[in-house]
Amino acid sequence: MGWSCIMLFLAATATGVHSQVQLQQPGAELVKPGASVKLSCKASGYTFTSYWMHWVKQRPGRGLEWIGRIDPNSGGTKYNEKFKSKATLTVDTSSSTAYMQLHSLTSEDSAVYYCAR
């Protein structure tokens, strides 16, 4: 029996009128079913601890699904009930980076994932 992979595409978006605000994600990830993956989102051009960071999922041909958000100042999180056991949100304020770890990956997790301020 052959092995299979799950493709995760990463993207970022920032709100506001300031063109220098940037959220950077590294690109695509290829992982095996059952594995975990940690996605990163590096922020620049604004005070990282002043805005919540949201994570959103989009599968081909489907709408956006809000996964959850984290307050970089306090580390407090709020999750969509559907993703409570799937995703873990964390931040590293020293590098202005937000992370989302996805657990026990399946084909249903193959999607584009956005971080959004």
Curated annotation (Swiss-Prot):
Residues 1-19 form the signal peptide. GO terms for biological process: immunoglobulin mediated immune response. Residues 50-54 are annotated as: Complementarity-determining-1. Residues 55-68 are annotated as: Framework-2. It comes from Mus musculus (Mouse). This is Ig heavy chain V region 186-1. Residues 69-85 are annotated as: Complementarity-determining-2. InterPro entries: Ig-like_dom (IPR007110), Ig-like_dom_sf (IPR036179), Ig-like_fold (IPR013783), Ig_V-set (IPR013106), IgHV (IPR050199). Keywords: Adaptive immunity, Disulfide bond, Immunity, Immunoglobulin, Signal. It comes from the Eukaryota. One of its GO terms (cellular component) is immunoglobulin complex. Residues 20-49 are annotated as: Framework-1. Residues 86-117 are annotated as: Framework-3. GO terms for molecular function: antigen binding. Disulfide bonds join 41-115. The keyword Disulfide bond applies. This germline gene belongs to a set of closely related genes that could encode V regions of NPb antibodies.
